[in-house]
Amino acid sequence: MEPNTPAIDPKKERLARWKQKKQQQDMLRQKSGASSKSSHDQAEDGDAARSTQPFEGLDKMAERRKRLELWKKKKKEQDEQKWKGDDAGQESATDIPVKGKAAPAEDAKAVPRGRKSRKGADPEKRQIWDDSDDELEAPKLKLFKPGSTIQTETPPDEDPEDTLDTYMNTIQEKNEVQLLAPREVFDQEDDETTAFDYNRTDNGTGSEFMRLAKLKAKKQLKPVIYSADELKPFIKNFYQEPEEISKLSEEEVADLRLSLDNVQVRGRDCPRPILKWSQLGLNSGIMNLLTRELEFTVPTPIQAQAIPAIMSGRDVIGISKTGSGKTVSFILPLLRQIKAQRPLGGDETGPLGLILSPTRELALQIHEEVTKFTSGDPSIRSLCCTGGSELKRQINDIKRGVEIVIATPGRFIDLLSLNSGNLINPKRIVFVVMDEADRLFDLGFEPQVNQIMKCIRPDKQCVLFSATFPNKLKSFASKILHDPVYITVNSKSLINENIEQKVEIFSNEEDKFKSLIHWLALTQQNLNDEKTIVFVSSQQICDILYNRLEANGFTTFAIHAGKIYTERAWNLKCFKETANGILICTEVLSRGLNVPEVSLVIIYNAAKTFAQYVHTTGRTARGSNKGTALTLLMNTELAASYILMKSMRDEELNKHHDATVSTLKQMSEKFNKGLKTGEYRLVKGFGGKGLDHLGKVYEEKHTEERNQLALEAGLAATEVSVSAPDGGLGDESTSVSIPKLDYTVKKRSNPDGTSTYFAHVQVNDLPQIVRWEATKYTTLSSIKHETGCSITNKGRYYPSGQGPQGPSDEPRLYLLVESATDQDISLAIDLLESKVRDGVRKSNMQEIRSNKYTI
């Protein structure tokens, strides 16, 4: 054969050989005529002829019935062996999900359509047909049900003892095919599916099953099992607790959380909350973004507790209402974690952090917030991936590498499954956030979220934020999160639900006292024993109020720390035994007093802390009883209005007059603005403990006594122009001027081409106590720790009107502040000014102690 001669197709060669044999058989059949029979039929007729010689009177039909019974018996035995799992004769059989077809023999090259053997066909012809890829006519297929077995049967009129029939039956047994149930089709391997699709020529149920299987497998993510060598350990804990937070006692921490909208924590070793941003060790750029652009002057309650917990490396579940600052709570720790990670390599696409969102709109909103923090840092790239957006562009961005991906679950699964899972490698994901996790589960994303979590490394840090905490979320958290910390912020749960809160606002003390008499008169009309407790802020006010109520005909009992123990015990006993009794007391009884009959608590002097308000109102509605807590509020008590707005429920506010609610909101908003600017501060706990706090208590007590005594003398209460402790609780007016620090920020060029900034802060002319407070070692060291600036005392102190006489003399006392950025210097001076304000307050307290009060 010549080299260029093409090779003969084996299939065509086999077909030509079959046609040649068929022509020879046709010629033999024509020669023998109609009496020509196949070898099998000849054997059958020969047996019949031999049997009819000795038994010519027997009916041929009886013999055929006998052979049919023998065939059925043998067939039954073969079926039983098959169902028992005897696969000795079926090693070469292949189970393929076909519909009523016989598989090929051991040496077959292709899978032909199975057909019933025809009576009268010779064995040679049947072998040729078995090897053929062509058919003379289409076979009639049996209807089938998924899971049933259809096989090629041997006709009952053939001799079971014939050798050729036995051989052919063996082939039939090998080629029997059992149909697969729909659920079994999904489990077939890819090579079997390929063989099935190649050999089938009809569109039956099997092909439909395979089409559904491919659709199902398209979105399925296989769980990734990581080995210990693949996962490099990473640091989770980046938080160092500030010294001023570490010094707080457990009781003070509990009161601090109570003042932060009743923050409740559950879990092992939860870090303490922070009070200001500088306690997190943030750089000046982020500090400016938080305080100036985002207007978070101080951390919100969820931020104050959640950020230290997340930065400590703990898995966190944060429950807080929308708009409470949850986004910043996870962005800051996420950025800190990414900065600590090894940068993405040339063949790595990322991400390092993943944020899952239930909706496109929320994902875009989170992406915008992340962009605000990363716009000045080219090393951190973020990408928003949501359904409905252009997938091609997202793929191109991922190929270039991204550190943060904000995505909806469905689109992230699409990205994970692209390119056989090679587009995104989840091995580098170390930080996962699920924002609005309750909505993720409400919208049915639980299966997708579970798939994603099984692909990410098991030692990841996971954070969930939600407005509610349904059972589905609890179950998910128990499976995915490791030893989580639960943080719940809900100021509306401060007060017992059985207590109805009320408030009345007054512009003068006399109207407030008249309202007190009105409410007490109503209690005396009750037929049932319903007692009343009136809380005041000092012992002097308690005694004055007791005398005035006695003069108005009320039987009252008074208890405060100034009375001896026996008198206090006697008054308490009489109060419990007197029907509709009235008790006037100070905060000494705000905790632990349990009198079930108390139905009304009147807070005559408004509470100044959340803890004080919670415990005073808690003296009513003991057990399953119901009660009322009434606050008589002066229009200057802004801190109390803020506490009431945080504590009162919406349905309670709706029961009040519109003018009262409007005034209360205005007072609360004014105090809230003062909190952000630093003009006001909210006292934590019950006002502090120890000798350091005695000055504040002393000042507050005498200020209130002065106002009350002026009222008793019939004089108008004069305004006391003294700053209230901690920024003005009680009387909010502050007429003390806070000196502004004199400084200028300058830039210095270094020989190596770098630049530094410095400022001279003049402190020589500050009052002595203020100057000491601003320049002492603890003040400067804390500012250095929070800002990273260098602060040095320079020069010496000169009395007022004096100064250096010549160039050799030291300059007037000042602080030299140095840093690499001007933002750090501005932050350090802001902190220094806060210390100056503390010094001014201490100076004023000394003046108050040195003066005598005159009426």
Swiss-Prot record:
UniProt keyword list: ATP-binding, Helicase, Hydrolase, mRNA processing, mRNA splicing, Nucleotide-binding, Nucleus
Classification via SUPFAM superfamilies: P-loop containing nucleoside triphosphate hydrolases (SSF52540)
Bias (Acidic residues): 155-164
Motif segment (DEAD box): 435-438
Domain spans labelled Helicase C-terminal: 498-668
GO MF assignments: ATP binding; ATP hydrolysis activity; nucleic acid binding; RNA helicase activity
Short sequence motif Nuclear localization signal: positions: 113-119
UniProt subcellular location: Nucleus
Gene3D superfamilies hit by this protein: P-loop containing nucleotide triphosphate hydrolases (3.40.50.300)
E.C. number: 3.6.4.13
Function noted in UniProt: ATP-dependent RNA helicase involved spliceosome assembly and in nuclear splicing. Catalyzes an ATP-dependent conformational change of U2 snRNP. Bridges U1 and U2 snRNPs and enables stable U2 snRNP association with intron RNA.
Domain remark text: The Q motif is unique to and characteristic of the DEAD box family of RNA helicases and controls ATP binding and hydrolysis.
Official protein name in the record: Pre-mRNA-processing ATP-dependent RNA helicase PRP5
